[in-house]
């Protein structure tokens, strides 16, 4: 033996040919494994394996684990545990794809790799996150520049992370929401660039108080074809970001009248509240009549609907008396007529006037609660009117929202609620005497029938009681008859069995009597037969000597 002294490995005893000889036979082996296999194959006696625990056993066999059933020795406890399944016929390793069971784990692994490799790869892909590393940065020299420096360009590909399907399914809802929000943002930016009127509606001042009271539905803007590549949208938006106008410049009604420019805009539109010129109720009615006439002439409007809307949208007379304008009723009428004509021309020429499900104007899409009664089947409806608050200039889509906004934001009294109209009962028709007499006669006949039925009720109950008692008597008599019939049947059965027994006994007695009589007469006949036999035999003996005598020569 020699000891390996290596600085990297623990000192171990090297096996030589002298120590690898079998203790039971003169064979020698080059390795411990071959010696163990030889002993398991040819020397499986338990006593021999136990002898290996002695001090003269070869190195590597001093800690052998022996099977209690067959006596085989193993170097490791795990090998012995696997071997014990041979004697118990247990197959604990079951294939999850086909249900085949195996005794060893290695056999199950081989089976899966051979028959279920595709399913195993799919199962592994569900739980793994595959991360592909980015390639190394490649630098390129473009030559020296005028400053003497050498510019370098680096190209690096970002790492790609492939999330497994299990994680994708768990986060699918959040990803869908995020993608939907991104698509909405991109669609909004594209519409702002292509449609300048979109900002007029989309960038209007919000009404937080009204939105808390009156529930409004948030509708997405016009659906446009979503581009396939986000990079194209970014390239389209990038050069136009610096040129786009601000929301304040796009809004025609300024929010704050503190500056001179904003005040001049309000004065030009007739919304300056500091002047002294006012309109009374008669002048306002005249302006309304003129507007009705011009609206009825325009081809894209409906006279009845717009007149009702205008009357509903107009503030009360006391509030109108406090409104002051610079241009008077002529300025106000001209402004409204110009707005109406512009909306009519836009409905004829622009593609936004087409009232389709996905291609209508932004104003109609942004106001889903607009009155559908103004739309007709033959002509395209005009866009809904945008009302404004006289105190803060806030745009309001519906006329019913304006009183609520004025009440909640500016302290105006709430609008009067119309009292419910009570419906008067219809006048009763005069009653005819003959019909009343007929009805009374029918009622009296019905009462007489009820009394007759009540009088006949006791008799019916008495008849039912009598019938019930008779039925009870019949049941008892029927039960008695059945019992008597059963008794007769039992008697007949007993008589039949007695007659049969008597017949059998008589037959047996007669046969016995006959045999006895025959036996009583039988002793005379045997004696006669014996006597006749003796006589026949004696006669035959006497005849034989006479024959011999006749045949003799003398």
From Swiss-Prot:
GO annotation (BP), single: regulation of transcription by RNA polymerase II
Entry comment describing in which tissues the protein is expressed: Expressed mainly in body wall muscles and ventral cord motoneurons.
Region (Disordered): 136-158, 298-319, 342-383, 516-554
Zinc finger (C2H2-type): 20-43, 65-87, 93-116, 387-410
Biased composition (Polar residues): 351-360, 370-379
Protein name: Zinc finger protein syd-9
SUPFAM superfamilies listed in its UniProt record: beta-beta-alpha zinc fingers
Annotated function: Plays a role in regulating synaptic function, probably by modulation of endocytosis. May be dispensable in muscle for normal locomotion. May be involved in post-transcriptional mRNA processing, in parallel with unc-75.
Main location: nucleus
């Amino acid at each position: 033996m020699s000891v390996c002294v290596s600085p990297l490995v623990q000192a171990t005893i090297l096996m030589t040919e002298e120590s690898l000889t079998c203790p039971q036979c003169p064979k020698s082996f080059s390795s411990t494994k071959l010696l163990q296999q030889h002993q398991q194959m040819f020397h499986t006696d338990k006593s021999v394996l136990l002898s290996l625990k002695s001090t003269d056993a070869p190195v590597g066999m001093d800690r052998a684990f022996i099977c209690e059933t067959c006596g085989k020795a193993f170097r490791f406890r795990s090998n012995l545990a696997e071997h014990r399944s041979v004697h118990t016929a247990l197959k604990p390793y079951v294939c999850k794809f086909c249900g085949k069971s195996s005794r060893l784990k290695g056999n199950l692994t081989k089976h899966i790799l051979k028959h279920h490799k595709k399913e195993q790869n799919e199962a592994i892909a569900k739980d793994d996150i595959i991360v592909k590393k980015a390639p190394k940065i490649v630098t390129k020299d473009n030559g020296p520049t005028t400053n003497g420096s050498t510019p370098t360009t680096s190209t690096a590909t970002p790492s790609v992370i492939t999330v497994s399907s299990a994680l994708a399914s768990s986060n699918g809802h959040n990803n869908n929401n995020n993608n939907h929000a991104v698509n909405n943002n991109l669609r909004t930016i594209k519409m702002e660039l292509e449609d300048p009127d979109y900002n007029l509606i989309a960038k209007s001042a919000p009404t937080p108080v009204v939105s808390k009271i009156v529930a409004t539905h948030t509708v997405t803007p016009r659906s446009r074809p979503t581009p396939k590549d986000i990079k194209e949208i970014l390239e389209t938006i990038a050069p136009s970001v610096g040129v786009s106008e601000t929301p304040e410049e796009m809004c025609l009604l300024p929010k704050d009248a503190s500056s001179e420019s904003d005040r001049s805009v309000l004065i030009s539109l007739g919304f300056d509240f500091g002047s002294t010129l006012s309109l009374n109720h008669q002048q306002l009615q005249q302006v309304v009549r003129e507007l009705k006439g011009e609206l009825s002439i325009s081809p894209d409007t409906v006279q009845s609907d717009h007149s009702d809307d205008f009357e509903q949208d107009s503030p009360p007379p006391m509030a109108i008396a406090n409104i002051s304008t610079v241009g008077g009723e002529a300025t106000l009428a001209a402004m409204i007529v110009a707005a109406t004509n512009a909306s009519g021309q836009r409905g004829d020429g622009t593609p936004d006037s087409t009232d389709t499900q996905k291609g209508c104007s932004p104003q109609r899409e942004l106001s889903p609660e607009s009155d559908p009664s103004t739309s007709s089947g033959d002509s395209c409806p005009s866009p809904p009117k945008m009302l404004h608050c006289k105190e803060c200039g806030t745009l309001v889509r519906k006329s019913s929202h304006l009183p609520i906004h004025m009440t909640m934001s500016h302290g105006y009294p709430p609008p009067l609620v119309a009292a419910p109209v009570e419906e008067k009962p219809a006048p009763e028709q005069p009653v005819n005497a003959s019909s009343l007499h007929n009805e009374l006669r029918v009622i009296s006949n019905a009462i007489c029938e009820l009394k007759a039925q009540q009088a006949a009720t006791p008799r019916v109950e008495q008849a039912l009681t009598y019938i019930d008692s008779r039925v009870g008597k019949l049941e008892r008599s029927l039960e008695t008859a059945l019992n008597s019939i059963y008794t007769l049947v039992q008697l007949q059965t007993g008589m039949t069995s007695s007659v049969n027994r008597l017949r059998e006994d008589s037959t047996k007695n007669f046969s016995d009597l006959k045999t006895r009589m025959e036996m009583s007469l039988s002793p005379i006949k045997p004696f006669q037969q014996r006597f006749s036999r003796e006589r026949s035999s004696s006669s035959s003996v006497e005849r034989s000597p006479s024959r011999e005598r006749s045949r003799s020569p003398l």
